[in-house]
């Protein structure tokens, strides 16, 4: 079994920056990319990985079934806890957990090796600045923030700009039109 990424997804995945920000239109494949990124870190021993969405319902609806399906295809799953939404990886004992940012204080106290903030523009910025940023500080964990555009007044734009100015950050932006074109070109290439 092989992971296949589009060229834009591969470009993002290949970035060696500690903090990566993706703003893209719908149907880019943000969730699929997030899952492949979690797998990259879960392949290492004893990693603690969190996927955080604005609400637990969103985390489950967006990611949970896809994550389980892909990990199962690779035969990576040792244990699934449906109550805590946590998967333990067979060979490495790493864990992937889905979390909600709607009560940020419940996210305190855990050191993380990798953190995904999905639809992060809809997450209260205090969850990042007051809670989650600290969770990757002592571990020097990596972060991938992704979501759809919410405008210049949203904190997501501030994070996007960091990727253009801070050497530890990288930012990527793709419009829905560019995404549609990329998928169309990939489909045409597969047919030929």
Place the predicted regions along the sequence by residue:
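Phosphate/NTP-binding elements of NTP-utilizing enzymes
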Residues: 1-185, 191
């Amino acid at each position: 079994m092989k992971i296949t990424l589009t060229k834009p997804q591969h470009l993002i995945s290949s970035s060696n920056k500690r903090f990566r920000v993706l703003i893209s239109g719908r149907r880019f494949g943000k969730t699929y990319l997030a899952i492949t990124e979690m797998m990259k870190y879960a392949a290492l021993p004893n990693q603690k990985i969190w996927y955080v969405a604005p609400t637990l319902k969103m985390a489950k609806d967006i990611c949970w079934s896809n994550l389980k399906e892909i990990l199962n295809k690779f035969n990576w799953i040792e244990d699934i806890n449906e109550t805590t939404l946590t998967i333990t990886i067979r060979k490495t004992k790493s864990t992937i957990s889905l979390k909600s940012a709607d009560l940020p204080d419940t996210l305190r106290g855990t050191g993380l090796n990798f953190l995904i903030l999905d639809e992060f523009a809809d997450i209260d910025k205090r969850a990042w600045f007051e809670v989650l940023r600290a969770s990757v500080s002592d571990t020097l964990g990596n972060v991938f923030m992704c979501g759809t555009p919410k405008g210049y007044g949203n904190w997501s734009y501030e994070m996007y700009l960091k990727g253009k100015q801070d050497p530890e950050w990288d930012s990527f932006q793709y419009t829905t039109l560019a995404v549609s074109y990329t998928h169309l070109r990939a489909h045409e290439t597969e047919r030929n």
